[in-house]
Amino acid sequence: MVITLLNLNKKHYLLILFFILLNGCSIDKNIILNKKQKQHKIFNLPITHTSKETHNFNYQDNKQSNNNYLEPLFEDYKPRNVGDILTIILQENTSASNSVSNNSIHNGNSNFDIDIGNARAFDDPNGILNKIELNSSIKNNFLGKGSSSANNTFVGLITVIVDRILPNGNLEVSGSKNITINDGIEKICFYGIVNPHTISKNNSVLSTKVANTNITYISSGPINIGSKINWLQRLFVSLFTLSK
């Protein structure tokens, strides 16, 4: 065997090396089946997401799941199956402003003349009643202005799960995160449609590149309660608004 290897030239060595590398790009069928069974055990639980439907991750019954679980040696990992995870980089920054101005001026004048005729019949030698003139004028000015502005910034990270694979290959993802700090609870929910081509090599995607995005942020605790006005203050605010 040693003599045979020594008699091989460089071309034969390159050919052997090529087949070794080619073997590294393939996986045994038994490994694939074992991987499917492990994933089936992990994800065969009903999980509630932010979407309206509750999905049961059963790979054997889900016809929309891609059965290709091969992970090539020279390819970056990207989610391509139901149950795969994906990191969403939240970078939402919205700004809106509105300004309204209305200026209305209305002027009106009216003249009304009455010619009585012979002033002597009314015992008016000076002719005061000879002609009576009535004048009236109306002037109405209205000036109104209004403006509003809003700025919202949302930055963070959340990891979501692929719920469904659309016919065109896009991924429907959703996920939630609960954070408890002292007595305060913060919950972030995310839902959207991800194009696999926008996923980076580190398995993340910007929230600005996700379609049909639905981001919900809910906070509860002493700080949230303290920021709300009580019923008595709301009553005074309502009365003050009606008095205007």
UniProtKB/Swiss-Prot annotation:
GO cellular component: bacterial-type flagellum basal body, distal rod, L ring; cell outer membrane; plasma membrane
Membrane topology: Lipid-anchor
InterPro entries recorded: Flag_Lring
Residue numbers with lipid attached (N-palmitoyl cysteine): 25
Subcellular location: Cell membrane; Bacterial flagellum basal body
BP terms from Gene Ontology: bacterial-type flagellum-dependent cell motility
Keywords: Bacterial flagellum, Cell membrane, Lipoprotein, Membrane, Palmitate, Signal
Lipid group attachment sites (S-diacylglycerol cysteine): 25
Family, similarity comment: Belongs to the FlgH family.
Oligomer and partners: The basal body constitutes a major portion of the flagellar organelle and consists of four rings (L,P,S, and M) mounted on a central rod.
Protein name in UniProt: Flagellar L-ring protein
